[in-house]
């Protein structure tokens, strides 16, 4: 074990797990990959890990527990499935391993690094919401810091090629989880999430649209400033995250009320924020910004945990 880096395990040797491994190996001064865990001995992720000198096992969670260096593992990323995660959580907690959950299981609290990491820094299990949540909840939260958000709706459009079998099987979980997090983390009174799989060729990078409905007397310039500042904050750990165009406003008065879900015909201002997320291309293609923002956010959370908890303890 390195004297300056905290060993982590990555459970799930698919696209997300492999991208996480490459990110840590190339970019992290705080973490080292202590194990890559899969269930398919022929997976590309396990093969790459072996070539890079990372300890591997195709024995799943029990294979991880049996590795000679398991006792050194402090943090585990779970990039498998919601069902498997519940089993992994119980076994890892018994050994005091902190867990960063990239599945829809949501055993622990939702975490978006720029919004609420500090509130949950010492929780044993942190859930990374969804790719759409990581891209859009920071914006909802920024707007909510300026004016009450009566309703927020997000549309995440991703390339079909970046949506693997896990994503396709969990569409309902994506919308439900993201909708809840828009309210619980973003601060909106009501929330709705929509995901669109775009089959266009060549594949398009991730696009996200955020709509927030706020009171007519909201300070629109303050909203613009808050959104631009928040985009810059997310961009620090997701370099491909950016505004696609200027923040837009549409006013609805007594003469042209807008029908808002759960509210009915209402007066207010519709705030529209258009984003795009380009992947860093560490392992995944650049158009897979939806996957890249998840791995980048998870890496950021793990590094903050390592710096705050383990480095200070000299572990």
From Swiss-Prot:
Acyltransferase as UniProt keyword: no
UniProt family annotation: Belongs to the acetaldehyde dehydrogenase family.
Organism: Pseudomonas putida (strain W619)
Binding site for NAD(+): 13-16, 162-170, 290
Active-site residues annotated for this sequence: 131
Pfam assignment, any one: AcetDehyd-dimer
Protein name: Acetaldehyde dehydrogenase 2
EC code: 1.2.1.10
Classification via NCBIfam families: ac_ald_DH_ac, PRK08300.1
GO aspect biological process, one term: catabolic process
EC main group: oxidoreductase
Alphabetical list of InterPro entries matching this protein: Acetaldehyde_dehydrogenase, Acetylaldehyde_DH_C, NAD(P)-bd_dom_sf, Semialdehyde_DH_NAD-bd
Reactions mediated catalytically: acetaldehyde + NAD(+) + CoA = acetyl-CoA + NADH + H(+)
Record's signal peptide: none
Organism domain of life: Bacteria
An example molecular function term from Gene Ontology annotations: acetaldehyde dehydrogenase (acetylating) activity
Keywords: Aromatic hydrocarbons catabolism, NAD, Oxidoreductase
HAMAP family cross-referenced by the UniProt entry: Ac_ald_DH_ac (MF_01657)
